[in-house]
Amino acid sequence: MATTANGNSKKRDGGLSSLAPRKINVQKFSEARAPELESLHSIVSERLNKDFRSKRNKRRRTNSYNNQPAKKRNIKRQKSQSLIGQVSGGDHEVKITRRVKRRMELKGNPETGFCTSGDGTKRLRTHVWHAKRFTMTKLWGFHLPLGLHGRGRGSRDVLKQSRQGVLVHDASYHIAVQLEGPEGSLLSILNMLLEPSPSSHSKEVFDSILTGGSYENAMLYHVEPPVSQAIAPVTYMWRPSKIPKRRNEEKGGDGIGTDLPVSDKDHEDFRKLWVWIHASSFSEGYAILKVACQKQMNETGVSVDCFSLEGQLAKLEIFGSKASHLLQKTLHPATSTSENPSILRKCSMEKAEVKNVADLYTEENVSSGAILAQFVIDPRLILTSPHDDRTVSVETIKTEPTESVETTTNTEAETFPEVFNCLWDANSELTPPEEENMLCWEKHQSRMDSLCLDDPAAEVPKVSSRPRSSRSCPLLLLKHKKLGNAPTGWSLILPLSWIKVFWNAFVSKGAHAIGQREKRWVSCDDGLPFFPSDFPDCKAYSSFTLSEAADLEEKAQRRPPAIRPFRIPIPPPWNSIHVTRSIGEGSNQKFSSNGRSVVEISSYGGNLFDGIVARTSDSLTTFLQTFTSDNMLLFPHNTSKPSTDLMMTLQEDDKKVRAQIHQSSNKLCLVRVLLHAFKEGSFEEGAVVCAPTLADISLLKSSCSEGEDGRVTIPQSSVSSYFQEQPCGTWELNVPEDTLTEQSHRWPIGFVTTGFVRGSKKPAAEAFCDAVLLGRLRDEQWRDKDVRRRKKQIYVLVRNLRSSAFRLALATIVLEQQDYCDVHCF
């Protein structure tokens, strides 16, 4: 080896070094090959006759060399950047355009709060992504994605994705309310407002909810009269906490299900509770929670804090057959290591660790309704190799020292509050993610180092004046309850500033984004209710349907009168069911001369629906007991009874239900049913469900009946006059007076709230029917029939409001098929 003046050693034989050159001099590289380039240029010039212009017959975009739109965009971009720099760096006030302001707002990622438009409507953090691909609409104070562009089709592809892929939905319009106070006071408030109440569950389920191991769904009601005016379906969850006096001291216990009953008040500790409410009913629900807290303080003298977490937490919903697989690819737990924060490093997880993370999200290892708590790495730093599944490459700079994976059912109470202070403590600052330009600069430096190249122009990018940022995110994973044919689903609760990071990661890994319309399709296909469309007893339903009716009326007025469709009632006239019930109670029912029933129908405040909806087996059973004169054959499903220690609380719930039922003898009690067409027919939203006669059933069941003789119809003139609009704007049932119309008239017992979905393998519509009338129909259809030939479904007639034909359908009462309650909203 010989040593040069610079001290570098080289090989004597003059061979090439195994190391790549530190720098490549492009000028010397081109000078060494100048003769080759000149000869190539001469050959090309001879072939083109020294005319290097493109031939006119070969030109396509003749002005492509002079790209004026691109130049204009570049000039505007430079002006915007200069204005943004002047605003951020200058001391004097600079007047900037609205476009620059809006771009700054939409590109920004503040720690808390939503961006708002000029009229105060809030935008989701994924607003820009959705606005480029979806039809946006203003709903409940938010700009929300309604659905893909077009006429509202595409349900087949969405249902296929739910069965074979994975869907993702930004549910940040759900807002959490946090309650803080003694455990006994919080339980009293929940028992006062929720149905089913926490204490009405079995001891095992109740202990799991109270310890924070699982969440629960319930209906939120008013605390003041009217006693049982429904507000909205909610999801509530407790902050996990270890209670020493309630723990079983045996060493072999797992700590779950060993709490003492609620009546044991030897130890009352300070607990925290989240109640998630839909945006359409948030103001009403938040107000009633504060009223309940004030009432609890007036009665007991114990203070309970209630405040909103709007703009702090976000929720993402993922469902589909491959939802667990998507979580395995995206969520990787942060390791408890500390490295130099200025150096980008690569770390790998062992095969066993990767297997443990992958098994965490499998359906067999996580129970339905469970809560998983994790600190995960920023998904932008995760690089997975598609060819090697033995290791997972992770690029990260610095991660907070946390446990790798934590499950609330196995979490020690001493570590869990410390890990998730940022989520559960409202006063704590939520750390936003690292900015995108910083991560891109670090990745660029990493690539340059791997190629052994120096970047002389490399400078640290400019970042916003944030005090701190993080590369790991705390989140809660909620496993959806398995109900019917619903696909596997998860809900992610995470800081609002992290929503765009995980949204882009899920979409880039194959998730199919959906809006409000697509989510309703999937909900109906799975047989689950969708809020607020399938909750007619809530004020949110009335306001939503009235706004839809106004939009449809505006579209109809744009059409010429000759082709303008006749008006139909939106929302459905639920009070018309009173007439059918009164007809069944006595054959001597008289009607006034103007066709209106003498049955008095009372108004119910601002709500268009006057009645109740039985959503639990207990409430339906209590309602059936008030009608002792009728032999109503309804069988609500009820699996487990609570322990005797909880009977006092159940008696309070029973009083609440009875007070609601006896408040007015004319109140309706509706139950949710699923309608399947017996032979043919497609049921639309708003279709009327009618009571058939035995002759109708035998006629429509006959396979040899064809033509008009084999159909049950009403006269074409009665289609538009079946419901009549009153001068005050309400709709009432038009009772027929002549004999011919009376023979074809069928009395309504309910209405369809969600129609058939195209592309469903087993189409079903969701409707609400009166429980009393369903019981009478079943009694009539089971009479004089052998027990083995009795169907559990009930035959009904369904007619779309613009059609004259009745279709035979089978109605399945959900409370007879589903365990315990019907409050699980999709």
UniProtKB/Swiss-Prot annotation:
UniProt superkingdom: Eukaryota
GO biological process terms held by the UniProt record: rRNA processing
GO CC field: nucleolar ribonuclease P complex; ribonuclease MRP complex
Recorded name of the encoding gene: POP1
Region (Disordered) residue spans: 1-24, 49-91
Pfam families cross-referenced by the UniProt entry: POP1_C, POP1_N, POPLD
Subcellular locations according to the entry: Nucleus; Nucleus, Nucleolus
Species: Arabidopsis thaliana (Mouse-ear cress)
Molecular function GO labels: ribonuclease P activity
Keyword rRNA processing among record annotations: yes
Name of the protein: Ribonucleases P/MRP protein subunit POP1
UniProt KW keywords: Nucleus, rRNA processing, tRNA processing
Major localization class: nucleus
Gene knockout outcome: Accumulation of unprocessed cytosolic rRNA precursors, especially the large 35S rRNA precursor, as well as of the internal transcribed spacer 1 (ITS1) fragment corresponding to the region between the 18S and 5.8S rRNAs that contains the A3 cleavage sites.
